[in-house]
Amino acid sequence: MIEPAASSPRAMIEYIAKAIVDAKSEVYIDEYEDGNETVIELEVAEADLGKIIGRSGRVARALRHILSAAGSKLNKRYALEIIE
C-alpha cells in the first residue's frame, strides 16, 4: 500500500513515482542544495525508466511542473533530475 504524499515536495515526488512504476522497492530519492535551488534526484529500475519519462517526456515534464508549483507555494526553487 502506498502512503499518501506528505507536505514535502520530496515525499510528493516519491509518492507519485511509486504509483507509476512496477518495482516500487527500487525507487530512490536524493535531495541536495545547488546554489539557490534544491535538486531532487529520482532513480528507478531500468525497466521502469520509460514509465517515469513517458512518451516524448510528458510524465517527466508533468513531474517537474508539479514540483515547480509546490516550490512556488513554499517560496523555493526545485529541480528534478531523473537518473538513468
Go through the PLM ranges and name each one.
Residues 53-57:
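Glycine-centered tight-turn and secondary-structure capping sites
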Residues 1-49, 62, 66-84:
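RNA-contacting regions in translation and RNA-metabolism proteins
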